[in-house]
Amino acid sequence: MSNLQAIIEAAFEKRAEITPKTVDAETHAAIEEVIEGLDSGKYRVAEKIAGEWVTHQWLKKAVLLSFRINDNQIIDGAETKYYDKVALKFADYTEERFTEEGFRVVPSATVRKGAYISKNCVLMPSYVNIGAYVGEGTMVDTWATVGSCAQIGKNVHLSGGVGIGGVLEPLQANPTIIGDNCFIGARSEVVEGVIVEDGCVISMGVFIGQSTKIYDRETGEIHYGRVPAGSVVVSGSLPSKCGKYSLYCAVIVKKVDAKTLGKVGINELLRSIEE
């Protein structure tokens, strides 16, 4: 355990006692160092190690602690002002820094300090919360929300109104993860630490949480909390055991490999689904 991690872990144990007035200098500095590290991409709340996603709980704890050490303050924003504990990521950005970091931010997009945005990303009017990581070449479309500590892979498209759940309220154990080369359809929600593996296509209006049944129609297998790589998913329903009613589920209607995904348009994949 590093010294920085040890400071965060110790502070989290006594978090109820920590306020902007009572926090000691060492703890304050440690929390700020973590937030800066998350902001720059040095740290990630979750990362893939040896093929498995690993959550660094101490980094998530630092994010939670950051709310304990800061008072609300006036935050300037275009034609308005805000009043919050967390600064905005781009508050002190210059044109040179935007050019250097290489992403686009459309007016009214909001990113909190402590979120990382990779090169070649496009942020339409959307919201990215503290601790989140947005991978290279990803599009966050209009009114999409990337929740606290959520991990978004490379070359992902989060369509209009998509919600990717966070970990802070309600408190979740692990962040929601969207793998590389995924497409998440308009108004879909992926929450509660669900992992969408690489190369998945999620149709419009699909809702997936930890208790959602993810039914593979080819194999009959039911998954919870994880969408297997290369899945094409639509919303559906499964009959109850008594046969008197049906309950919502997500249905894996087909699997595609990276080669097919690269050649075939998203709309074609979804339109070619046999009923």
UniProtKB/Swiss-Prot annotation:
Pfam families: Hexapep_2, THDPS_N_2
GO CC annotation terms, alphabetical: cytoplasm
Record EC number: 2.3.1.117
Major site of localization recorded for this protein: cytoplasm
Membrane-spanning residues: none
Disulfide bonds: none
Catalysed reactions, semicolon-separated: (S)-2,3,4,5-tetrahydrodipicolinate + succinyl-CoA + H2O = (S)-2-succinylamino-6-oxoheptanedioate + CoA
PROSITE patterns: HEXAPEP_TRANSFERASES
InterPro entries noted in UniProt: DapD_Trfase_Hexpep_rpt_fam, Hexapep, Hexapep_transf_CS, THP_succinylTrfase_dom1, THP_succinylTrfase_N_sf, Trimer_LpxA-like_sf
CDD domains: LbH_THP_succinylT
Family designation: Belongs to the transferase hexapeptide repeat family.
PANTHER family: 2,3,4,5-TETRAHYDROPYRIDINE-2,6-DICARBOXYLATE N-SUCCINYLTRANSFERASE, MOLYBDENUM COFACTOR GUANYLYLTRANSFERASE
Pathway recorded for this protein: Amino-acid biosynthesis; L-lysine biosynthesis via DAP pathway; LL-2,6-diaminopimelate from (S)-tetrahydrodipicolinate (succinylase route): step 1/3
Binding site for substrate: 104, 141
Subcellular location field: Cytoplasm
GO biological process terms on file: diaminopimelate biosynthetic process; lysine biosynthetic process via diaminopimelate
Superkingdom of the organism of origin: Bacteria
Quaternary organization: Homotrimer.
Name this polypeptide is given: 2,3,4,5-tetrahydropyridine-2,6-dicarboxylate N-succinyltransferase
Keywords: Acyltransferase, Amino-acid biosynthesis, Cytoplasm, Diaminopimelate biosynthesis, Lysine biosynthesis, Repeat, Transferase
GO function term, MF aspect, one: nucleotidyltransferase activity
